[in-house]
């Protein structure tokens, strides 16, 4: 039995909501994957705040219609597609997808869309090599802390240096 029009509209609304919350979408050809393998992919993505949805291309087409951020996804809507929608840890999610593909050797990436732009395979691999947002923030915080420490030491050194100079000058004057 097919889906009702109301059910299809509900699915399209849900997909639109997921897309609005997502930073990146990766389209995978899931042909040949078992339910167990799809569950494995979903569990790997869960830790990176990614969602894997299998939906009809026609419903995805309706969900992206008129949305300038996701319109370019249209060119990838052929064949059997699983859509990985990534909310936050883009690099971690892409790493999880690549790890899954390496382990199963069944799925392949058709393409990805990030900030309204289609990405090439090499760009997708580059994203996977990036550190997570938390690691980058920690590096920035460390760098800022280092600068603040150096400034504090420098500021503290000016009066200390002046005091030493005055002391040396007074000792010379006394002798």
From Swiss-Prot:
InterPro entries: Ribosomal_uL10 (IPR001790), Ribosomal_uL10-like_sf (IPR043141), Ribosomal_uL10_bac (IPR022973), Ribosomal_uL10_bac_type (IPR047865). Forms part of the ribosomal stalk, playing a central role in the interaction of the ribosome with GTP-bound translation factors. Part of the ribosomal stalk of the 50S ribosomal subunit. The N-terminus interacts with L11 and the large rRNA to form the base of the stalk. The C-terminus forms an elongated spine to which L12 dimers bind in a sequential fashion forming a multimeric L10(L12)X complex. The gene is rplJ. This is Large ribosomal subunit protein uL10. It comes from the Bacteria. The keyword Mitochondrion does not apply. NCBIfam families: PRK00099.1-1 (NF000955). The keyword Nucleotidyltransferase does not apply. One of its GO terms (molecular function) is large ribosomal subunit rRNA binding. GO terms for biological process: translation. GO terms for cellular component: ribonucleoprotein complex; ribosome.
